[in-house]
């Protein structure tokens, strides 16, 4: 008996650990991952969950209606049939999709999370990642377009419709890939020791990558708008020395500054807290990030609600089209100019070009 017991195979502790690390948990319940990460999984609706869900649904409805209004306005008004407006329509489409994705999340959160499988949970998160990535990519595309337009002194870029379509396809391809990456393998289902606390099926490394990707995009936008501001400020100062219209130059610079502050301020307020929270989830285990998760996610979603206001409502022509649509009025002169309307790609670009072109002979 003693000899038999000595001859039986014994698995050492390092071998057991290696086998455990290679094990995958595709058939486990969502509760398994949540319990292991320490994230609370509700069994019933409490006051906070109901409040978050109510706010979330309200924001979703506003996002979808506001962005639908933008898309309809660009479609019905032929003055908007230019590349910049096509990008704005695509931004509205991305934000509309964000509203749908977040709406789906609202009905599959809280106690309803327990009913999800691994695949449906990854789908739920993938929709959010795809929609938000598409929105951010569109913001970057618009910033690049504005940069090119201002530096070439054009009302509209000379980009062909085909190139606009290519840009839009690239944006959505990148967004879909970013949203699908966790589902196709970059998750912690087979690496259970490196699961995130905020997203218990997501790998820590993916969340760090996603957060840094968006923060880098933010930095690029800051650089682009800062470059535009510096360029216009230099031009207005040169024009002030050679022209009798310093007030117009000052107004142009202030209009640009206001737009830059709105754009960057909205992005900082809506996105930075959530992105920092993702990094803290990985880099600061003792930080109680789960206490703020839902509210910061809701705040990030507000960016999709603010985009139509920032990029569309400041345009006088867009505002007039909004009123016509909401009041069921016909646009009697869809091709002609409207007095007092801003027919440029944005009111910002129109004021820049108006100041530059009216004084260009004195600068050169």
UniProtKB/Swiss-Prot annotation:
Signal peptide: none annotated. Residues 1-50, 108-121, 185-204, 281-294 are extracellular. It is found in: Cell surface; Cell membrane; Endosome. Disulfide bonds join 24-190, 188-195, 284-287. GO terms for biological process: adenylate cyclase-activating G protein-coupled receptor signaling pathway; adenylate cyclase-inhibiting G protein-coupled receptor signaling pathway; bleb assembly; cell chemotaxis; cellular response to 1-oleoyl-sn-glycerol 3-phosphate; cellular response to oxygen levels; cerebellum development; corpus callosum development. GO terms for cellular component: cell surface; cytoplasm; dendritic shaft; dendritic spine; endocytic vesicle; endosome; GABA-ergic synapse; glutamatergic synapse. InterPro entries: GPCR_Rhodpsn, GPCR_Rhodpsn_7TM, LPA_rcpt, LPA_rcpt_EDG2. A 1-acyl-sn-glycero-3-phosphate binds at residues 39, 124-129, 210. Keywords: Cell membrane, Disulfide bond, Endosome, G-protein coupled receptor, Glycoprotein, Membrane, Phosphoprotein, Receptor, Transducer, Transmembrane, Transmembrane helix. It holds the Pfam family 7tm_1. Residues 76-83, 145-163, 226-255, 316-364 are cytoplasmic. N-glycosylated. One of its GO terms (molecular function) is PDZ domain binding. The keyword Transmembrane applies. Glycans are attached at residues 27, 35. The chain crosses the membrane at residues 51-75, 84-107, 122-144, 164-184, 205-225, 256-280, 295-315. It is a multi-pass membrane protein. Detected in brain corpus callosum, medulla oblongata, cerebellum and sciatic nerve. Detected in heart. SMART domains: 7TM_GPCR_Srsx (SM01381). Interacts with RALA and GRK2. Interacts with GNAQ and GNA13. Interacts with CD14; the interaction is enhanced by exposure to bacterial lipopolysaccharide (LPS). Belongs to the G-protein coupled receptor 1 family. PANTHER family: G-PROTEIN COUPLED RECEPTOR. This is Lysophosphatidic acid receptor 1. It comes from Rattus norvegicus. The lineage of its organism: Eukaryota, Metazoa, Chordata, Craniata, Vertebrata. The gene is Lpar1.
């Amino acid at each position: 008996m003693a000899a038999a017991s000595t001859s039986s195979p014994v698995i050492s502790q390092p071998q057991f650990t290696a086998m455990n690390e290679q094990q995958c948990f595709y058939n486990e319940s969502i509760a398994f991952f949540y319990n292991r990460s320490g994230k609370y999984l509700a069994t019933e609706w409490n006051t906070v969950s109901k409040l978050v869900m109510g706010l979330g649904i309200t924001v979703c409805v506003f996002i979808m209606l506001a962005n639908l209004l933008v898309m309809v306005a660009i479609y019905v008004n032929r003055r908007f049939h230019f590349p910049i407006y096509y990008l704005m329509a695509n931004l509205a489409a991305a934000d509309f999709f964000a509203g749908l994705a977040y709406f789906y999340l609202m009905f599959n959160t809280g106690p309803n999370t327990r009913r999800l499988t691994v695949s449906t949970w990854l789908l739920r998160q993938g929709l959010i990642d795809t929609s938000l990535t598409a929105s951010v990519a569109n913001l970057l595309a618009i910033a690049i377009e504005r940069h090119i337009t201002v530096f070439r002194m054009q009302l509209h870029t000379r980009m062909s419709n085909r190139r606009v379509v290519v840009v839009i396809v690239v944006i959505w391809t990148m967004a879909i890939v970013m949203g699908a990456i966790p589902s196709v393998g970059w998750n912690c289902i087979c690496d259970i020791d490196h699961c995130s606390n905020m997203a218990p099926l997501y790998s820590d490394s993916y969340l760090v990558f996603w957060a840094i990707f968006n923060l880098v995009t933010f930095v690029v936008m800051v650089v682009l708008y800062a470059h535009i501001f510096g360029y216009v400020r230099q031009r207005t100062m040169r024009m002030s020395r050679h022209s009798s219209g310093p007030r117009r130059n000052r107004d142009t610079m202030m209009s640009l500054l206001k737009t830059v502050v709105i754009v960057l301020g909205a992005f900082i307020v809506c996105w930075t807290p959530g992105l920092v929270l993702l990094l803290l989830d990985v880099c600061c285990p003792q930080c109680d990030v789960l206490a703020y998760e839902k509210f910061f996610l809701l705040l990030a979603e507000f960016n999709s609600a603010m985009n139509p206001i920032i990029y569309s409502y400041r345009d006088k022509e867009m505002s007039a089209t909004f009123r016509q649509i909401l009041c069921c009025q016909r646009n009697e002169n869809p091709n002609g100019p409207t007095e007092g309307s801003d027919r440029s790609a944005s009111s910002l670009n129109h004021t820049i070009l108006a100041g530059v072109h009216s004084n260009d002979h004195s600068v050169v």
